């Protein structure tokens, strides 16, 4: 074992002078069991319908268009489809999930429920929503949308209370006040049902502030009650502000079952759509590519806030988004990030994707897959090598055995040669 320190030293020298395996700023996959969710920057169908076809519109390599591993829609996002009438049924399945969408609901759209509302609250909602999506897609293979049927026994219909520009909220639905109620101080209920999926992401939302109607202020109060298990989920307004508040949403992960939506004050809300989560899998971190505009439009960082290790790896370009088709489509930096989908890679980490699994100049943080076992850690004065000890000990033993064999062979031939000279 006296050879081990020398072996480590030699390995350090060889590693520092020769082979390098740095993490690369791409999204990739271990094998063919992967899926990408996106928008126009990866929507092959959108390019096909343009005349003439111009694949520079996308950041995705066109070679992946026929892979069957992409669910993307120009002008949309999973969050936008979840809450609003502008809907696309994102559907996909894979062990390794990649997201490159979210830009189609940003401060640039300036959405708020009412004229005195707050877009900041909707950015907060976006972050909370994607946190649940990313966490759950690290343990589920399949994502799609399902409609949530509900039964309300009153005569009032759902109302488009929350809308701004072209966006109209329809999840959750608002049930209008019954004609025989003089104000909003009343209790009302509706049944809804979740079936067919392993789990569901559903919204539970309230106006967190004093809601003014006909000179009266109301505190919002909403609950969901699982009639099968007895579990209740609820939110009550706690803020005393009268302006600058908006629709605060929590995103619940619920099992199948029969539920009761309950409002104790203001309007009843009931979920109409849910993210359907199916097919449990071994924990596999998702990968998220930053989805933002050119700097001429205001973007947000909510997907970055939502994407945290160990369940998520975040990839971003260091420069402004500048497309070649137009300023918001076909950026070289993001095209480079997506180029990793063209090949398999053995190791993923917070710093990036490793192309090889032997050694690297960077120790992988939050590693997943077959990752490098060694790294050069450079201090200001002395380079130090840190290794996973088991393979190094094993290699040291093999090297020691090899040296012993060589020494034995040398001694054998030296003795044999001496005997021959003596005989001569």
Swiss-Prot record:
Class in the EC hierarchy, top level: hydrolase
Segments in the Virion surface topological domain: 17-392
Any one GO cellular component localisation term in the record: membrane
Transmembrane portions of the chain: 393-413
Cysteines joined through disulfide linkages: 44-65, 113-162, 197-276, 205-249, 307-312, 347-371
UniProt-listed InterPro entries: Capsid_hemagglutn, HEMA, Hemagglutn-estrase_core, Hemagglutn-estrase_hemagglutn
Protein name: Hemagglutinin-esterase
Species annotation: Bovine coronavirus (strain Ontario) (BCoV)
């Amino acid at each position: 074992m006296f050879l081990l320190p020398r072996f480590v030293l030699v390995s350090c020298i060889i590693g520092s002078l020769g082979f390098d395996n740095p993490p690369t700023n791409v999204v990739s996959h271990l094998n063919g069991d992967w899926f990408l969710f996106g928008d126009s920057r990866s929507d092959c169908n959108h390019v096909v319908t343009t005349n003439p076809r111009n694949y520079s519109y996308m950041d995705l390599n066109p070679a992946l268009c026929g892979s069957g591993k992409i669910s993307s829609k120009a002008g949309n996002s999973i969050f936008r489809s979840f809450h609003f009438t502008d809907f696309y049924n994102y559907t996909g399945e894979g062990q390794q999930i990649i997201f490159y969408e979210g830009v189609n609901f940003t401060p640039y759209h300036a959405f708020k429920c009412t004229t005195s509302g707050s877009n900041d609250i909707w950015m907060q909602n976006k972050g909370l929503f994607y946190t649940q999506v990313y966490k759950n897609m690290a343990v589920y293979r399949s994502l799609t949308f399902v409609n949530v049927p509900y039964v309300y026994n009153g005569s009032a219909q759902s109302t488009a209370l929350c809308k701004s520009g072209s966006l109209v909220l329809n999840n959750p639905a608002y049930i209008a006040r019954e004609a025989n109620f003089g104000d909003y101080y009343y209790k009302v209920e509706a049944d809804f049902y979740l079936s067919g999926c392993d789990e569901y992401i559903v919204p539970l939302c309230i106006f967190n502030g004093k809601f003014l109607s006909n000179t009266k202020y109301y505190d919002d109060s909403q609950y969901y009650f699982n009639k099968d298990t007895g579990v209740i989920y609820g939110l009550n307004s706690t803020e005393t502000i009268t302006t600058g508040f908006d629709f605060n949403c929590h995103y619940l992960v619920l099992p199948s079952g029969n539920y009761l939506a309950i409002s104790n004050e203001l309007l009843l809300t009931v979920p109409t759509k849910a993210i359907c989560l199916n097919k449990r899998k071994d924990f596999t971190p998702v990968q998220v590519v930053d989805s933002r505009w050119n700097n001429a439009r205001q973007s947000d960082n909510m997907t970055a806030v939502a994407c945290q290790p160990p369940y998520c790896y975040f990839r971003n370009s260091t420069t402004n988004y500048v497309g070649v088709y137009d300023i918001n489509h076909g950026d070289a930096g993001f095209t480079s990030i997506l180029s990793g989908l063209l090949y398999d890679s053995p190791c993923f980490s917070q710093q990036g994707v490793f192309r090889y699994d032997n050694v690297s100049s960077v120790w992988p943080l939050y590693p997943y897959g077959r990752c490098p076992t060694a790294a050069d850690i450079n201090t200001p004065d002395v380079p130090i090598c840190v290794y996973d000890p088991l393979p190094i000990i094993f290699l040291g033993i093999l090297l020691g055995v090899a040296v012993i064999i060589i020494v034995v062979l040398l001694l054998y031939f030296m003795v044999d040669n001496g005997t021959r000279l003596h005989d001569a």
